[in-house]
């Protein structure tokens, strides 16, 4: 079992993943586990500290979430955040009740006592609150470390036990010195060293791959995107002669995607590539299917079938490698009290029975860490910083049924969007950009004639790891040119809209 410097127990906060990210940014390896993980599993990870995340529940409610009380007897530093703070207070017999004044947004705190969390930080700072309950009295054995206007117990702790509790969220960017607070907890309370980086990760994963695979062969599924390209490069660095790299044209690719992928692997990466055209089988199975989850399941199942057929042509193939990321795992499974958001075709979409063992060397890292790993492995910036493209491809960018006419419309619109972003310098400034073909038509006028054609939505977002995102504030003239070109150059589209939703509450992809 992989060891972790700090374990984050997930009680359902939308920010839980950010806690792990902020710690990893400091070179400390943090891992997220469900709140009800067993004490045995916690001990097996040999953590140096534990963080209790926030969450939507109330500790006094009948359906409250509680972790194993034994964690408080492990002689490990513990940091409680929001719900985690209230849980710690509740455990030590303090009263937690509904707050008369709910707090959502920025607040000012004042540090009242020097302590490990606020070492070398200003006495007054701005933090981000998001809670509807409050701690009414100080738990026995604890002391106040900081206060806010609405909370005399905003931060409390027991420095002998190295237990600390925060009412606010240090993991979000709106908390002025949040990263420093988490870093101080890891460094001064937990005695963690900043040794986690992609160089050490690459070395560890290569050794793990060699040990697990032995003399068998690995079928590596690639899409041409960053994730699968990095997986292929990592496998090649570990067991190059045992890797069979396969690219499947599922009929759901962007314009000229197949040709670009083949060129990149053969000429840029120097990796032999087997290219399979399976577009007919994918599109036939997607016919008349409109439910997004069903689309993902069908695509996931069909991918595996195609790969298994290819594996039969090669001796000693026992493994299938995929570019599954930590974000995929989080969004596809119930981690702690968190809810399933959507199935990813390479996680929840997989059949329960496979004839190939799955190997996912990136499943413990986030997107920005994948990019850093790619550079560490020698991939070019052009490959590493390519915009993400989902495994299900354009199928989840067409609302409703997927068919060839719709795919062709979407491809043409997408080409124009990317051309305009690249020519204006906005492509490299954004995380992801694509078009969505909506399953609605609208009335328009072109020349002197009435039209009743399709509407396309432009989605361009800024992000660092894909867990959260904001819509990109593109200049009006850029948006205007994109809209004008799509309507004038793509027959069958007469309306273009811009998605100004952030994640959360929306996801980046529409399906």
Swiss-Prot record:
One of its GO terms (cellular component) is cytosol. Homodimer. CDD domains: GATase1_GMP_Synthase, GMP_synthase_C. PROSITE patterns: GATASE_TYPE_1, GMPS_ATP_PPASE. Catalyzes the synthesis of GMP from XMP. Keywords: ATP-binding, Glutamine amidotransferase, GMP biosynthesis, Ligase, Nucleotide-binding, Purine biosynthesis. The keyword Phosphoprotein does not apply. Its EC number is 6.3.5.2. One of its GO terms (molecular function) is GMP synthase activity. It comes from Campylobacter jejuni (strain RM1221). It is an enzyme of class 6 (ligase). This is GMP synthase [glutamine-hydrolyzing]. NCBIfam families: guaA_Cterm, guaA_Nterm, PRK00074.1. Pathway: Purine metabolism; GMP biosynthesis; GMP from XMP (L-Gln route): step 1/1. The active site is at residues 82, 169, 171. Residues 5-195 form the Glutamine amidotransferase type-1 domain. ATP binds at residues 223-229. InterPro entries: Class_I_gatase-like, GATASE, GMP_synth_C, GMP_synth_GATase, GMP_synthase, GMPS_ATP_PPase_dom, NAD/GMP_synthase, Rossmann-like_a/b/a_fold. It catalyses: XMP + L-glutamine + ATP + H2O = GMP + L-glutamate + AMP + diphosphate + 2 H(+). It holds the Pfam family GATase. Residues 196-386 form the GMPS ATP-PPase domain.
């Amino acid at each position: 079992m992989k060891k972790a410097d700090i374990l984050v127990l997930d009680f359902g906060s939308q920010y839980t993943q950010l806690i792990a990210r902020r710690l990893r940014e400091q070179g400390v390896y943090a891992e997220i586990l469900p709140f009800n993980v067993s004490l045995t599993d916690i001990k097996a990870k040999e953590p140096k500290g534990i963080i209790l995340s926030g969450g939507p529940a109330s500790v006094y409610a009948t359906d409250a979430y509680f972790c194993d009380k034994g964690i408080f007897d492990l002689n490990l530093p513990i940091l409680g955040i929001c719900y985690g703070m209230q849980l710690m207070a509740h455990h030590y017999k303090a009263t937690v009740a509904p707050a008369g004044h709910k707090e959502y947004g920025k607040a000012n705190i004042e540090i009242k006592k020097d302590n490990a969390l606020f070492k070398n930080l200003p006495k007054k700072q701005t933090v981000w609150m998001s809670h509807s309950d409050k701690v009414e009295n100080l738990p026995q054995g604890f002391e106040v470390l900081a206060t806010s206007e609405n909370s005399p117990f905003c931060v409390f702790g027991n420095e002998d036990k190295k237990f600390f509790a925060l009412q606010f969220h240090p993991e979000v960017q709106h908390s002025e010195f949040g990263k420093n607070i988490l870093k101080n907890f890891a460094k001064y309370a937990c005695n963690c060293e900043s040794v986690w980086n992609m160089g050490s990760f690459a070395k560890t994963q290569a050794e793990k791959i060699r040990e697990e695979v032995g003399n068998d062969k690995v079928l590596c599924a690639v899409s041409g995107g960053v994730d699968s390209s990095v997986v292929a490069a990592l496998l090649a660095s570990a067991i190059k002669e045992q890797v069979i790299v396969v690219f499947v044209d599922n009929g759901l690719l962007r314009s000229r995607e197949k040709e670009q992928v083949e060129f990149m692997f053969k000429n840029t990466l120097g990796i032999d590539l087997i290219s399979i055209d399976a577009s007919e089988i994918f599109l036939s199975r997607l016919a008349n299917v409109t439910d997004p989850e069903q689309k993902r399941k069908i695509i996931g199942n069909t991918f595996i079938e195609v790969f298994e057929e290819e594996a039969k042509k090669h001796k000693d193939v026992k493994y299938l490698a995929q570019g599954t990321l930590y974000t995929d795992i989080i969004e596809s499974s119930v981690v702690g009290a968190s809810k399933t958001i959507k199935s990813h075709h390479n996680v929840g979409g997989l059949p329960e029975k496979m004839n190939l063992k799955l190997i996912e060397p990136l499943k413990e890292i986030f997107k920005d860490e994948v990019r850093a790993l790619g550079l560490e492995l020698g991939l070019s910036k052009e490959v590493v910083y390519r915009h993400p493209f989902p495994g299900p491809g354009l199928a989840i960018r067409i609302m409703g049924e997927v068919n060839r006419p719709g795919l062709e419309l979407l491809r043409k619109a997408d080409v124009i969007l990317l051309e305009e972003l690249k020519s204006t310098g906005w492509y490299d400034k954004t995380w992801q950009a694509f078009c969505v073909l909506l399953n609605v038509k609208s009335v328009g006028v072109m020349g002197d004639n009435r039209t009743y054609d399709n509407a396309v939505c432009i989605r361009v977002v800024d992000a660092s790891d894909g867990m959260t995102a904001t819509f990109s504030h593109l200049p009006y003239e850029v948006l205007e040119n994109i809209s004008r070109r799509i309507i004038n150059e793509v027959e069958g589209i007469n309306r273009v809209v811009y998605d100004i939703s952030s994640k959360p509450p929306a996801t980046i992809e529409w399906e």
